[in-house]
Regions:
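Mature, structured domains of secreted/extracytosolic soluble proteins
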Residues: 1-277
Length: 277
């Protein structure tokens, strides 16, 4: 299907498919000065963690303890009292950015790492989502859908904190083919504490397409992987790199899985730039 993983046998059998990216509850991510300071995340200065995370120019900061952000959007007026609650006004329309896998797929310069990550995905029939959708469809006179699938990733930790290590047909995925955690899992929490999804989230250190090209193309530190496991008869060129990565995944006995797992981090709080080294 258009927009779904390429060169992935779990998807290639479908001419069309109804699929959701994840069936767990999306988290609303807040950045507050108090929370950042409590976790030793820098909030002021030219190279502050907050400035880098915001993607702003020099000087980005949270310098007022009352300031807060939801995703990338600033709360400009807060705690407006109403008869039945409070209003918090934000400067832009709030749009959830999607989970890690979705963002990698949508960004213009992360197509190669997204392709590699999606080698580890498969569509799983989701009876609950199918039933919920059809209940809504019947109520509002819309067509029902026979089957809705959920896009999930082979991983040592997935929804509910348990592994997702079986294919849709029930075959076991070896350790060498499992990601550290499911990059499509909206409600991720670390293995140490199921309750800390309210306090922390996962992270991934993502290489751009150019960085991956520099690594795998001739002269890069990983060009020998393509020479050993690349597609037969294809030169190691930029144009051929997607096909060569496909072959490397199929023949490389977990090399690309290890490549991704080296980037995956279990804690955002512990992975901000000021804590490197």
């Amino acid at each position: 299907p258009e927009g779904m993983p390429k060169n992935n046998s779990y998807w290639s059998g479908y001419n069309s498919i109804h699929v959701v990216s994840d069936a767990t509850r999306p988290m609303m991510v807040h950045f507050t000065r108090e929370q950042m300071l409590a976790n030793n995340i820098t909030t002021t200065g030219a190279d502050s963690d907050f400035g880098i995370l915001r993607g702003d120019s020099v000087g980005a900061s949270i310098d007022n303890s009352q300031e807060a952000y939801i995703y990338q959007t600033k709360v400009v007026k807060q705690d407006v009292t109403c008869l039945n609650g409070y209003i918090h006004q934000v400067e832009d329309v709030l749009v959830p950015p999607g989970n890690v896998a979705q963002v990698l797929r949508s960004e213009k310069n992360t197509k190669l790492i997204s392709r590699i990550v999606d080698y580890h995905s498969a569509p799983y029939y989701d009876a609950t989502t199918t039933a919920n959708y059809n209940s809504w469809a019947l109520q509002y006179g819309q067509p029902t859908i026979d089957s809705i699938f959920q896009m999930r990733y082979f991983s040592s930790r997935s929804q509910g904190g348990v592994p997702n290590i079986l294919t849709p047909a029930g075959a076991a995925i070896p350790n060498s083919g499992r990601l550290e955690w499911d990059l499509g899992w909206n409600q991720y929490y670390s293995s140490t504490d199921a309750a800390n999804y309210l306090d922390d989230m996962g992270a991934i250190l993502v290489p751009t397409d150019e960085a991956i090209e520099n690594y795998f193309l001739p002269g890069g530190e990983g060009d020998f992987f393509i020479e050993l496991y690349g597609a037969e008869g294809l030169e190691n060129t930029k144009e051929n790199l997607p096909a060569n990565l496909d072959a490397l995944y199929n023949k490389g006995n977990g090399i690309l899985t290890t490549f991704v797992n080296n980037m995956i981090q279990t804690s955002f709080v512990a992975t901000v730039p000021s804590k490197f080294g």
